[in-house]
Regions:
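Catalytic palm active-site di-aspartate
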Residues: 1-26, 43
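Helical (often loop-to-helix) elements that flank the catalytic cores of nucleotide-handling enzymes
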Residues: 18-39, 49
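Right-hand nucleic-acid polymerase module
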Residues: 34-166
Length: 166
C-alpha cells in the first residue's frame, strides 16, 4: 500500500491510498483522521501519535481480539466450569509457549510507531494477566518488535500523478 499526499487546497489536504490488493468488506473509507471513526484498512487504522504525527496502528477490533486471545491463553479455554469444578487452566509451560507463539505471530505486522506501541501494550497486558494468574512463575518475555526502516519519500509532479489517479 502507498500513500500519496496531494498539495493543500485551501483548508484541506487530500490523502490518496493506493493498494495492490482489491478492497473487501474490511475497508471503510471516510475522513482519515476522525478520532471517533478513523480510516481503517484491513487490520490497521490511521491515527495520530502522542506527538501529533500521523501513523498506522492496529485497529480497535484487532487490539481487542488479541487481548481476548491473551486472556484465554493464560487463564484457560473459557466457558463455565461444572458445579464444584475449577476453571480449566493450561499448565504454565503450555501457556507460556502459546503466548510466545502469539507474540511471534505479531512480529509479522510492520514496525510502524503506532503498531509498535500497540504490540508493546499487548505485551504489558500479557505480563499483568500472567502475574495475576501465575504468581511465582516467570512471565513470558516477548521478542522486541523490529523497526520499519524509514525510506526517503518520493515526490512527483501533479502531471505525473494525473494518469495514476484516473
Amino acid at each position: 500500500m502507498q500513500l500519496v499526499i496531494l498539495p493543500p487546497d485551501r483548508d484541506t489536504i487530500t490523502l490518496v491510498l493506493l493498494s495492490n490488493m482489491p478492497p473487501d468488506d474490511r475497508e471503510q473509507w471516510q475522513l482519515a483522521l476522525d478520532p471517533d471513526w478513523p480510516l481503517r484498512w484491513r487490520n490497521y487504522q490511521l491515527s495520530r501519535g502522542p506527538t501529533g504525527a500521523i501513523t498506522w496502528r492496529l485497529s480497535a477490533a484487532i487490539r481487542e481480539h488479541y487481548r481476548v486471545r491473551i486472556n484465554r491463553l493464560i487463564t484457560g479455554r473459557g466457558g463455565r466450569p461444572g458445579p464444584g469444578d475449577r476453571p480449566y487452566q493450561y499448565p504454565p509451560e503450555t501457556a507460556r509457549t502459546q503466548v510466545l507463539l502469539l507474540a511471534q505471530h505479531l512480529q509479522r505486522y510492520p514496525g510502524l510507531g503506532g503498531v509498535r506501541r500497540d504490540v508493546y501494550a499487548l505485551a504489558q497486558h500479557s505480563t499483568r494477566v500472567w502475574q495475576s494468574t501465575h504468581p511465582g512463575q516467570p512471565y513470558p518475555h516477548w521478542p522486541t518488535m523490529p523497526y520499519l526502516p524509514y525510506r526517503q519519500p518520493q515526490t512527483a509532479s501533479l502531471s505525473e500523478l494525473d494518469g495514476v489517479l484516473k
